[in-house]
Amino acid sequence: MDKVDKSLDTWREELTDEQFHVCRLGGTERPFTGAYHDSKTPGIYHCACCGEALFDSDAKYDSGSGWPSYFQPINDEVIASLDDYSHGMHRIEVKCAKCDAHLGHVFPDGPRPTGLRYCINSLSLKLVPRD
């Protein structure tokens, strides 16, 4: 996978203010406000910054958290994980492996088959519906 390397100024020009805050500065959208938190449209969720395919709607479920939740990414290579100690707690941050966009966090309280909950900001995603 070829990495996307752009300056913050370039990202700021290409993204909405809200997308820039979440994807490039690591912000979080308020729960139950994102476009995809309750979407049931079949399709593939892509990175809003670089277009990389990240999650299939078949792995999406309602976690009750207010953010889109998935039990697995399309494959392990599309997601980068790193320790996040912000806000006085330890979490695992997930980013797009291609462009380093902040997506959200992964928690060990998801459903089978993985037991994982990828809690993702809608602003980090773009849904491409299935035909």
UniProtKB/Swiss-Prot annotation:
PROSITE patterns: MSRB. GO terms for molecular function: peptide-methionine (R)-S-oxide reductase activity; zinc ion binding. Zn(2+) binds at C47, C50, C96, C99. Its EC number is 1.8.4.12. The keyword Manganese does not apply. Keywords: Metal-binding, Oxidoreductase, Zinc. GO terms for biological process: protein repair; response to oxidative stress. Residues 8-130 form the MsrB domain. Binds 1 zinc ion per subunit. The zinc ion is important for the structural integrity of the protein. The keyword Oxidoreductase applies. InterPro entries: Met_Sox_Rdtase_MsrB, Met_Sox_Rdtase_MsrB_dom, Mss4-like_sf. It catalyses: L-methionyl-[protein] + [thioredoxin]-disulfide + H2O = L-methionyl-(R)-S-oxide-[protein] + [thioredoxin]-dithiol. GO terms for cellular component: cytoplasm. Its cofactor is Zn(2+). Gene3D superfamilies: Peptide methionine sulfoxide reductase (2.170.150.20). The active site is at C119 (nucleophile). HAMAP family: MsrB (MF_01400). Belongs to the MsrB Met sulfoxide reductase family. This is Peptide methionine sulfoxide reductase MsrB. The lineage of its organism: Bacteria, Pseudomonadati, Pseudomonadota, Gammaproteobacteria, Pseudomonadales. The gene is msrB.
